């Protein structure tokens, strides 16, 4: 009798995705982040669901409802901090996952890569709206600054901003719709993640060497299930260390002050995982130019497959490209640091140089380096 997991219509899908899936034998720990992202997403949906049971999306009670969750609800504090720090872990895994894709040339699976970019935008939108919900000072002013950027759109900008606000300023209508969208978008992300996997399983996984491994595959279970469990344990350990020892390490103290439209915080800044994009936005003095640079800083990923000029897939055997990749990582860390600094000398010029370098590496230096490396290999 054939095993039920291979015949049952539903079990068959799970079997072909997580059990009998042919997998390259040499994929490293950098391939763990996909499963970790899945765990993060499920964790965020579950903790978010329990938070939504006690949260009230109303400008007068939102802040106190979050306080109530932390003080009065059974284990409310741990749920709240797991949700807040879970978002940070989510973005750490996301950036690692994308870095792996860039380094090893996984972007040559264009459908998988493009779905990934849409997923990134979805999760960034979700995280931004989630930051608004506690209705602290940084929630309110962060939302004001970011939504105001849409007024840079020619002709329809102001109408667009008022349409999103649901009025002439950020108020009850804005908070309510942000809560509704913050609740629904993770489920959209879940569906997109399924499509992401669907396209990935059409081609099979890439591997560190970049050489096709069709002739040499091993089953996903037990080899990679056990490896993923190790990754998951390390993820949960890191998250719980953060939650239990320094839950406010990555947050902003200003968000413990209830939102006040009459008092602007001295430094308005988003959560740490958006600081690199915020630095790029601020590095351009023109409003529309800044907004375009902000969007392009992420959308640039979509043209990476078109700029792939190397005869090799990954960077494993390309030392010059490796140097450029790590320069890009250092540049992004610099941008993250600059995004959290006040707009004054020398931070302005450092931010502008780092922004120029970011686009130069991706658009100019990497394709040229690949061509040079191709020619070196011909000798």
UniProtKB/Swiss-Prot annotation:
Protein residues bound to a ubiquinone: 201
Mode of membrane association: Multi-pass membrane protein
Stretches that traverse the bilayer: 33-53, 77-98, 113-133, 178-198, 226-246, 288-308, 320-340, 347-367
Cofactor, how bound (note): Binds 2 heme b groups non-covalently.
Alphabetical list of InterPro entries matching this protein: Cyt_b/b6_C, Cyt_b/b6_C_sf, Cyt_b/b6_N, Cytb/b6-like_sf, Cytochrome_b, Cytochrome_b_C_euk/bac, Cytochrome_b_N_euk/bac, Di-haem_cyt_TM
MF-aspect GO terms: metal ion binding; ubiquinol-cytochrome-c reductase activity
Pfam families: Cytochrom_B_C, Cytochrome_B
Subcellular location: Mitochondrion inner membrane
Gene3D superfamilies in alphabetical order: Cytochrome Bc1 Complex, Chain C
Function per UniProt: Component of the ubiquinol-cytochrome c reductase complex (complex III or cytochrome b-c1 complex) that is part of the mitochondrial respiratory chain. The b-c1 complex mediates electron transfer from ubiquinol to cytochrome c. Contributes to the generation of a proton gradient across the mitochondrial membrane that is then used for ATP synthesis.
Family: Belongs to the cytochrome b family.
Assembly description: The cytochrome bc1 complex contains 11 subunits: 3 respiratory subunits (MT-CYB, CYC1 and UQCRFS1), 2 core proteins (UQCRC1 and UQCRC2) and 6 low-molecular weight proteins (UQCRH/QCR6, UQCRB/QCR7, UQCRQ/QCR8, UQCR10/QCR9, UQCR11/QCR10 and a cleavage product of UQCRFS1). This cytochrome bc1 complex then forms a dimer.
Annotated protein name in UniProt: Cytochrome b
UniProt organism field: Mirounga leonina
């Amino acid at each position: 009798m054939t095993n039920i997991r291979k015949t049952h219509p539903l079990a068959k899908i799970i079997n072909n995705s997580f059990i009998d899936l042919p997998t390259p034998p040499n994929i490293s720990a950098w391939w763990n982040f996909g499963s970790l992202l899945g765990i993060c997403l499920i964790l965020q949906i579950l903790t978010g669901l329990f938070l939504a049971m006690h949260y009230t999306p109303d400008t007068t009670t939102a802040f106190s409802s979050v306080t109530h969750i932390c003080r009065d609800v059974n284990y409310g504090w741990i749920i709240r901090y797991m949700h807040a720090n879970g978002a940070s872990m989510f973005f750490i895994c996301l950036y690692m996952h994308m870095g792996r894709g860039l380094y090893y040339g996984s972007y040559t699976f264009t459908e998988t890569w493009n779905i990934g970019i849409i997923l990134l935008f979805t999760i960034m939108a979700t995280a931004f709206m989630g930051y608004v919900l506690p209705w602290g000072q940084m929630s309110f002013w962060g939302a004001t600054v970011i939504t105001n950027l849409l007024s840079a759109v020619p002709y329809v900008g102001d109408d667009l901003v008022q349409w999103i606000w649901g009025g002439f300023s950020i108020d009850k209508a804005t908070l309510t719709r942000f809560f509704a969208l913050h609740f629904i978008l993770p489920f959209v992300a879940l569906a997109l993640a399924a499509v992401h996997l669907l396209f990935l399983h059409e081609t099979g996984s890439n591997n560190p060497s970049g050489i096709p491994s069709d002739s040499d595959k091993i089953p996903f279970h037990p080899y990679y299930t056990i490896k993923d469990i190790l990754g998951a344990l390390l993820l949960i350990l890191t998250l719980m260390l953060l939650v239990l020892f320094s839950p406010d390490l990555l947050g902003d103290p200003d968000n413990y002050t209830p939102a006040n439209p009459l008092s602007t915080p001295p430094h308005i800044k988003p959560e740490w995982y958006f600081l690199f994009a915020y630095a790029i936005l601020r590095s351009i003095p023109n409003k529309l130019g800044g907004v375009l640079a902000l969007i392009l800083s992420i959308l640039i990923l979509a043209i990476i497959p078109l700029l792939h000029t190397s005869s090799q897939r990954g960077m494993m055997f390309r030392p010059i490209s490796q140097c450029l990749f790590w320069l890009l990582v250092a540049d992004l860390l610099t941008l993250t640091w600059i995004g959290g600094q006040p707009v004054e000398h020398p931070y302005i010029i450092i931010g502008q140089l780092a922004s120029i370098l970011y686009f130069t590496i991706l658009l100019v230096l990497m394709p040229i380096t690949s061509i040079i490396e191709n020619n070196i290999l011909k000798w």
